[in-house]
């Protein structure tokens, strides 16, 4: 376990893991700007401004850029977040077109899909995250006059706690196929909690349920050296964050293999292929190459509950 993480630690959108959610929202805001915008997320920028972290505000205002950095220059960051966002957007769109009317966004952070996607009538979208993060986003978007485009139900709980019970108490229907997303989440969970997350998802899923997540197969992706390099880049942005304090390390099960063993039919989508599909050139920076073998994963539950 990272020395900076403790059992039961909590955060809002300006601290610890929560600040990384704001970082992602800032990237979506940048990708949504200008006549050649890659994304359409009009709520990302106001959420970032409401959090109030100066480096992220400067990023969305175009006042902080590192054109010499192949990972953190505005264009590279916009393309990276576009690949990721479009993958999960398309996942939910495809799931609802297949008839699924129940969705769960795990570690929802500042995700705005419950507000910006066109959900079919009768769709219920559950968002699960830390209480402070849920409250902040709900209040901020209400003050902006934004309204969900589906029935949005929030579950304020840490994913290391008994979130399945909280989800059921919130009205989740275990008899209905569900579209699940675990976006940008797994490194923030201990290895055993990652397995438990997928066990719980499987136990809660009716046949035909779908799941989207990511996997980095390189066991050295979060080595001390690489985490130090990530931290250096964050500090260059003016962020007082240490990657080694946020990520849990240790040997993990391969996501695709683990889900297959639980009865899911898994389809991996290598990041390089998704870059090409979106018309982008994959960055050849060493840090980006580390994640070049990363796969976005979608899966469908073929049998009964595990």
Swiss-Prot record:
For this chain's UniProt record, which GO biological process terms are given? methylation
- Binding positions (S-adenosyl-L-methionine): 129, 158-159
Gene3D superfamilies recorded: Vaccinia Virus protein VP39
Q: What class of enzyme is it?
A: transferase
So what does this one do?
Answer: Exhibits S-adenosyl-L-methionine-dependent methyltransferase activity.
Gene Ontology molecular function, alphabetical: methyltransferase activity
Query: What protein family is recorded?
Result: Belongs to the UPF0677 family.
Q: Which domain of life is it from?
A: Bacteria
Q: What is its EC number?
A: 2.1.1.-
Record-annotated membrane-spanning stretches: none
Q: What is this protein called?
A: Putative S-adenosyl-L-methionine-dependent methyltransferase MAP_4190c
Q: Which Pfam families match?
A: LCM
Q: Which InterPro entries match?
A: Ppm1/Ppm2/Tcmp, SAM-dependent_MTases_sf, SAM_mthyl_Trfase_ML2640-like
Which UniProt keywords are present, listed alphabetically? Methyltransferase, S-adenosyl-L-methionine, Transferase
